[in-house]
């Protein structure tokens, strides 16, 4: 992704625009596997291969929730599974922080640990790749057909580890006044209604928070002419979320 801090398609003439090890882009990883709107019977589209590079650790960890819902043994969502399987995920170490970064308070490190195929790090104009899956190893083997790769020295590996440690310590200092995530449930239960009333006053039910958050997995399936089945992300903030046949709302 480029200077706009959005994922962008990499072309030969835009390779130099890639920003490495920067905080997360505005586009969540979720939208690649569960788009806001998609035709779920368009098999050709879902069979396209792609590489998603520069994914922060927080987004990779959030994928656990989506996988738990859409790859559950009881029923595996075929569209979501194809989107996942046809993607090579390259996670990125975070070397700088944004104002609201607080992954460590949730037990997440500022460098990839799960749900990715490779990790990318940039130190002193040298790109380091670490394989984390069989898919990642196969991709490295393909890359070696076109360019030379070298094993890092022990000092280079230590430099990467030192940078990770420094960023993690900076995050811990920055968020030292935040509560432990294990206490979040108790804090919510004891907060009362006033705080929810305060924030609901400015909510316009746009559903943007649900669209980007990996904990929100609801969708609505619409059937259109020509055997087109369109899945839309749904959200409990939408005024019509609870409506059923004939426009009835059982929660009112």
Task: Cite the ranges covered by each PLM segment.
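A sequence-composition feature that detects small, non-aromatic residues
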Residues: 26, 166, 208-211, 235, ...
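Local cysteine-cluster metal-coordination motifs and their immediate loop/turn environment
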Residues: 56-61, 104, 201-220, 231-241
């Amino acid at each position: 992704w480029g200077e706009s801090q959005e994922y962008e398609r990499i072309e030969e003439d835009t390779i130099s625009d890639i920003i490495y090890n920067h905080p997360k882009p505005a586009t969540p990883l979720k939208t690649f596997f569960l788009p806001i709107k998609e035709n779920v019977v368009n098999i050709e589209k879902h069979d396209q291969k792609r590489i998603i590079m520069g994914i922060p650790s927080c987004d990779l960890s959030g994928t656990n929730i989506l996988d738990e819902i859409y790859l559950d043994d009881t029923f595996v969502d075929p569209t979501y599974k194809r989107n996942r399987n046809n993607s090579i995920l390259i996670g990125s170490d975070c070397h700088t922080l944004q104002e609201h970064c607080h992954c460590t308070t949730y037990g997440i490190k500022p460098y990839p640990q799960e749900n990715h195929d490779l990790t990318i790090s940039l130190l002193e104009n040298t790109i380091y790749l670490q394989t984390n899956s069989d898919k990642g190893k196969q991709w490295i083997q393909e890359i070696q057909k076109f360019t030379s790769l070298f094993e890092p020295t022990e000092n280079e590996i230590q430099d990467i580890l030192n940078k990770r440690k420094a960023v993690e310590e900076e995050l811990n200092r920055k968020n030292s006044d935040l509560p432990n995530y294990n206490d979040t449930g108790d804090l919510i239960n004891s907060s009362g209604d006033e705080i929810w009333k305060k924030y609901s006053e400015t909510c316009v039910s746009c559903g943007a928070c649900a669209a980007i958050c990996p904990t929100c997995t609801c969708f609505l399936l619409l059937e259109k002419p020509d055997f087109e089945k369109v899945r839309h992300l749904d959200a409990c903030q939408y005024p019509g979320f609870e409506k059923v046949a004939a426009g009835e709302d059982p929660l009112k």
